Amino acid sequence: MLSVAILAAGKGTRMESSIPKVLHKISGKSLLQRVIDSCVELNPDQIFVITGHKSKEVQESIPDNKKIHFVIQEPQSGTGHAIQILCREVKKNEGKLLVLNGDVPLITPETLKNLLNLHDSKNADVSLITTKKKNPHGYGRVFLKGDFIERIVEEKDCNNQERLNLLINAGVYCFNWENLSEIISTLQSNNNQNEIYLTDTVSMLKNALSLEIEDNGELQGINNRIQLSKCEEIIQNSIKEKHMLNGVTFINQASCSISEEAEIGKDVIIEANTHIRGSTKIFNSCVIGPNTFIENSNIGLHCEISNSTVYDSQIMDHIKVGPYSHIRPKSKIYSYSKIGNFVEIKNSQLEEESKVNHLSYIGDSIIGRSTNIGAGTITANFDGQKKHQTKIGKNSSIGANTVLVAPINLGESVTTGAGSVITKDSKDNSLAISRTKQVNIDNWERKKP
C-alpha cells in the first residue's frame, strides 16, 4: 500500500503575499497542483494534503479526487508535527508513506519512483532524496555512515564544521509507515527553531538510505519570487524546446510564454511577446504575434494574428486578425474572413469571407457570408437590462459609421447608408438609410472664447 503526504501548511512569509505559498502559479498551475500531479503518476492508494495557513483556500483550489484527503495542522509547529497529526487521524498506518513538500513543483514522477524502488529493494525503514549543492545555504545537511544515513542537521542548528558538508536533504522521504508511527509521537522541539523536525526520525530508525541525485534544479523549493521566476523559466524553456523540435519557430522565444496544454502545429511562427494560454490549439502554418495573447481558443490553418487578443473563440482557416483586435469569448470566425485594426468581436459568428476592417464593435451577432462591415460600425446590443442579437444576411454591405440597434434582422444583399442609425428590419436586396437632412448655413461666424 502506498500513501502520500504533501506538506502544504506553511504561510510562505518570504513570498510577501496574501496568497498561500503553495497556491502561487507556474505556467498557469499552482505549485501544489504540480506536486499532486507528479504524485498521482505513482498511482497511490491515498494522498493526504496537510494544510494550515488559509486551509479553506488551499482545499478549494484542488479539483475533487476520491483519493485526495485533507488534514489540518494547527498550529504549524514543524514537519514532524504535521506527520504526528496525520498518524493520529489515519487509523491504519501501514505500507509505505511518501512525504514531500508542496513547494517543489519540478519534482518528477520518475525520481519519486526511483526513491520507492530503492526503498523496496533494500527493505528500508526510511529512504530520502539527497543532492550535493555548491551553495547549500538554507538546507539541512545529511551525514552518512557507510551506506546509511546517520543523522540530518538543519541549517540553523549546524555548527561551523557541519555547514561545510555539501550533501543536503531535499525534503522527500519514503517511510515504512508502521515503523514511523511507533516513534513519531516521541519527537520533541529541542532545537533553535522550537519546531518538531521530521528529520529527527532518521537517526531513530535503523535502516535509513540516501538516493543521491544530480542537482539539476528538480529539487528546487520555492521560498521567494526569485525562485518562483527561475522555476517558471525552467518549465517554459522545456515547453518551448518541445515545440521547436516539433517544427515551431520562435522569434525571441524568451519573451514568449506557452501553456503546457497548448498544441501548436508545424511551420507555425511565434513572434516576440506572444503568450499562448490554456488549452489553445494552433494548426499548421500560422504566424502569431508579435504582442498577441490567445487563451483557450482554436486557430485554424494559415492564419495571421498580430498585436491582438483572442479569448475562448474559434478562428478557422486563412484568417487575418489585427493589429489591435479583441476577439472575446464565444466568437467564431469562419475561413477567409478578416478582422482588422481596432475591432472588437464578442459572442458573434462571422461566416466565410466576411470583413470587419476598421474601428468596429460586433456583439451578439450573426454576420452572413461575404458581408462587409464598414469602418465605425456598432451593434448596439444592450438596452440597459439585457443583450439582443443582430443578424445580417450574406453579401451585405454595412456603410461606415452605421449603428445597428438590436434586436434587428437584415436580409441578404442589404446595403446601409453611411452614418445611419438602423432600428428596423430590412428585407433582401434593400437599401436602409436613416439620417437627418444636412443643413448648410452661409456666412456663419464662430463665437470666439
Swiss-Prot record:
Co-factor(s): Mg(2+)
Main location: cytoplasm
Residues that bind Mg(2+): D103, N223
Region (Pyrophosphorylase): 1-225
Chain sites annotated for binding acetyl-CoA: A375, A418, R435
Keyword entries, A-Z: Acyltransferase, Cell shape, Cell wall biogenesis/degradation, Cytoplasm, Magnesium, Metal-binding, Multifunctional enzyme, Nucleotidyltransferase, Peptidoglycan synthesis, Repeat, Transferase
Active site, per annotation: H358 (proton acceptor)
CDD domains xref list: GT2_GlmU_N_bac, LbH_GlmU_C
Annotated pathway: Nucleotide-sugar biosynthesis; UDP-N-acetyl-alpha-D-glucosamine biosynthesis; N-acetyl-alpha-D-glucosamine 1-phosphate from alpha-D-glucosamine 6-phosphate (route II): step 2/2; Nucleotide-sugar biosynthesis; UDP-N-acetyl-alpha-D-glucosamine biosynthesis; UDP-N-acetyl-alpha-D-glucosamine from N-acetyl-alpha-D-glucosamine 1-phosphate: step 1/1; Bacterial outer membrane biogenesis; LPS lipid A biosynthesis
Cofactor binding, per record: Binds 1 Mg(2+) ion per subunit.
Subunit structure as annotated in this protein's UniProt entry: Homotrimer.
Function: Catalyzes the last two sequential reactions in the de novo biosynthetic pathway for UDP-N-acetylglucosamine (UDP-GlcNAc). The C-terminal domain catalyzes the transfer of acetyl group from acetyl coenzyme A to glucosamine-1-phosphate (GlcN-1-P) to produce N-acetylglucosamine-1-phosphate (GlcNAc-1-P), which is converted into UDP-GlcNAc by the transfer of uridine 5-monophosphate (from uridine 5-triphosphate), a reaction catalyzed by the N-terminal domain.
Similarity annotation: In the N-terminal section; belongs to the N-acetylglucosamine-1-phosphate uridyltransferase family. In the C-terminal section; belongs to the transferase hexapeptide repeat family.
UniProt protein name: Bifunctional protein GlmU
Gene responsible for this protein: glmU
